[in-house]
């Protein structure tokens, strides 16, 4: 039976936060740099009169302009060539529908419906290893998690962390995660 690699979508596959911040900057005439965001609470970084409205921009249309994380497609292809089953596990926002699934297929990831999961608690999905940018999610995964470095998780100390897809694939080829 193939080992399963679970991949988060937001900011591991697709550059969602940079796209969201670009939209916010345009609408609110601001110059917020997504690389300065060091926490999950975006309301701490946007103008006070924007506040929670920042999350309203996470609708299905935003995914039309989301770019791919560098080397994500290459990395997924490498995992598949190495014989792993790749599944995409993501939390979904209200009013986004199938936008992430459609984005994946539009960008050549060739994902079947049974390899795409939307859920808040990713530990409910069976995988041998999870690559995610959310510290709490990786922590819940125990030894099965790898933290994908982003500015918002730099303050979190976690021993299994990668800064790029190239580094993740190198570690996979060297069997650093014991699969």
What are these regions (language model features)?
Residues 9, 89, 148-150:
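Generic beta-sheet signal
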Residues 63-67, 72-104:
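Substrate-recognition element of Asp-dependent hydrolases with the DxDx(T/V) motif
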């Amino acid at each position: 039976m193939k080992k399963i690699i679970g991949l988060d979508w937001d900011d591991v596959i697709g550059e969602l936060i940079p796209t969201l911040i670009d939209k916010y900057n345009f609408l609110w005439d601001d110059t917020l740099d997504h690389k300065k965001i060091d926490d999950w609470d975006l309301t701490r970084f946007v103008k006070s009169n924007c506040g929670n409205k920042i999350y309203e921009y996470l609708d299905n249309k935003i995914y039309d302009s989301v770019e791919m994380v560098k080397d994500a497609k290459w990395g997924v292809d490498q995992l598949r060539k190495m014989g792993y089953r790749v599944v995409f596990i993501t939390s979904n926002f209200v009013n986004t529908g199938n936008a992430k699934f459609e984005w994946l297929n539009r960008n050549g990831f060739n994902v079947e419906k049974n390899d795409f999961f939307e859920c808040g608690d990713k530990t409910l999905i069976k995988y041998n290893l999870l690559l995610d940018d959310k510290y709490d999610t990786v922590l819940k995964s125990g030894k099965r998690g790898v933290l994908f470095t982003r500015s918002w998780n730099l303050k979190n100390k976690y021993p299994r962390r990668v800064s790029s897809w190239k580094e993740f694939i190198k570690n996979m080829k060297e069997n650093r995660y014991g699969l």
